[in-house]
């Protein structure tokens, strides 16, 4: 069975835009959990445009209470600032079930590509993965359906990949879908779990899962 994790960033974004406490992030997240989802996903960015560190701690406690998975996305190179504790520090403090590493820049509106790990970067990235895993957190990498990059992710010690599904959502053709199907089977063959996310919704998810029965999909922004 494929687990469903809902990204609640935009609930926090709307709350912050209003400058008030509503919509209430915790209340709506609990409603989602009570409706049957298996996980909550957040992407706390250094500029705090939506999810804040306080949100991360509160959602972590909610997920523990409700026995659902908590997935934190972000760039491992995001350093501490006056308002942000740094991504790795936050992960090691919260110890989420899963950490999804995303290669985005601080001012990027949304994630729009997967990792391109060079051979010369393997040792440094492997150290990051091992550091996160000391928190008993599963490590996943956001990746395009690129077999060589999936191999690299396996070599640095991650447990899962998250297939970036933006291109599929824009063009759900058999040719595009076949690329994801090949990537899925390759990842499984070398022992990786497979998640998928980005612009997936009720209109395109059923077709995707018919060919790519991922361990987890995430929806929302």
Where would I find each of the regions flagged by the language model?
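Glycine-rich phosphate-binding active-site loops on the catalytic face of alpha/beta enzymes
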Residues: 38, 43, 99-108, 160-171, ...
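Conserved N-terminal beta1-alpha1 strand-loop-helix module at the mouth
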Residues: 1-70, 76-78, 92-94, 151-156, ...
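N-terminal small/glycine-rich loop or linker at the start of catalytic domains
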Residues: 1-17, 109-113, 125-134
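Catalytic cores of alpha/beta
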Residues: 59, 79-93, 146-156, 196, ...
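Alpha-helix-loop-beta-strand connector modules within alpha/beta enzyme cores
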Residues: 34, 49-74, 118-140, 174-198, ...
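Glycine/small-residue-rich loop that forms an oxyanion/phosphate-binding "nest" at active or ligand-binding sites
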Residues: 60-118
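Active-site beta-loop-alpha junctions enriched in small/polar residues
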Residues: 7-13, 45-47, 73-79, 104-106, ...
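Glycine-rich tight-turn/loop motif centered on a GG-T
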Residues: 16-18, 109-123, 166-177
């Amino acid at each position: 069975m494929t687990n469903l994790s809902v990204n609640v960033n935009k609930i926090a974004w709307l709350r912050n835009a209003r400058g008030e406490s509503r919509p209430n992030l915790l209340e709506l997240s609990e409603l989602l959990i009570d409706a049957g989802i298996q996980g909550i996903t957040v992407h706390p960015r250094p500029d705090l445009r939506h999810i804040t560190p306080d949100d991360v701690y509160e959602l972590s406690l909610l997920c523990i209470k409700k026995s659902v998975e908590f997935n934190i996305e972000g760039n491992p190179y995001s350093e501490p600032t006056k308002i942000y504790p740094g991504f790795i520090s936050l992960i090691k403090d919260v110890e989420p079930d899963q950490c999804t590493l995303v290669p985005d820049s601080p001012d990027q509106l949304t994630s729009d590509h997967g990792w391109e790990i060079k051979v010369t970067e393997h040792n440094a990235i492997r150290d990051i993965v091992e550091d996160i895993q000391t928190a008993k957190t599963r490590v996943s990498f956001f990746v395009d359906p690129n077999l060589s990059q999936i191999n690299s992710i396996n070599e640095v010690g991650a447990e899962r990949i998250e297939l970036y599904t933006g291109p599929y959502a824009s063009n759900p053709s058999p040719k595009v879908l076949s690329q994801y199907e090949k990537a899925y089977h390759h990842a499984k063959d070398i022992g990786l779990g497979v998640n998928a996310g980005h612009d997936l919704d009720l209109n395109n998810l059923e077709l995707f899962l018919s060919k790519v029965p991922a361990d987890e999909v995430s929806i929302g922004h």
